């Protein structure tokens, strides 16, 4: 279903930080994370506990409620270790693979669009996504109340601890433990920092487990009156136990899967980023008296790639040290310059410029690739030697070996050999390797290509 206009405005507003997320077990159900909802996990763990002689049939009044199972085991053994170890190990919580929703959530945290995420889950899928994108210096991860002193401006909070907690007794499975930690540690921070965002979305809350319902009610009670709350769930509103428990108005219910929700949010954000990139290209054309190039197809290709892949593409093109490069106004001119140059090359050569997810650009004619390039910007301060060294270092990471690099945004004068390699698609054979060795890639500056259309026709034959 379409997202509410207020939510679309919040995700695209300048400055960001207007949205906070509260995530439940339903967010980890989608593949490849593939962790079942709490009721399924609880029922299976209860079966194992009975089979292993730790519980007897009937000792737990509700085997589908993980809190009830934990309470039953705690009453018998004064410990919840038997529940925690089975939950952690059977479902691979430490090494959970991020699904698309988690990748997008990590990107939106990194971008500063989402100010905070509070997760009620124990798996580390979202932490893994943040790490893989290189967000460690920007996004704080608060796994326990003791970590609150290390929080950053943007944070991921594990309200119930997570699979990294070495002591199984510290996992918040029972409502008594939740209330103790909430009043003693979480309440002032969550209320003043996390839930102060103008918009809070509860997503994937899933099965109405006692500790989850209690957590959600505590979070709801801490919301400022001006905060707009939404509940996203894939099911029918009449069957949403959390919707009933929170006594919400039907207008705030969003019927959506977790990944679908994040895709819709990120699509609106990316539309804004692409629009600003197009505007930057217009300014660049006017300021430098360049030909009016048609970059609509290239911008459309970026929109179709999605926010995570576009962030990775920015990192490739700007020679960034991390896997993901956030959107910033100060690099728009650099990116626009590269896109305009690609459009010029396509127009002059009569070939189609196709952006590849790994950062390369292929020029195709009649369905055949006639040239393949790395794209590299000096970011306005790197000279030829620095760019060349960085390009050579990165060339082995591409899915297919490019034969040359297109370079822009450099700090000094640039000269390139006038003769391109014999085969612009495959490159030249190394004289030092009986196979095809690491010969230096030719570098072509986009300024030189703009001034010499004959060179364009050579490099895109």
For every predicted segment, state its role:
Residues 15-68, 129-141, 221:
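Adenosine ribonucleotide-centric catalytic and binding domains
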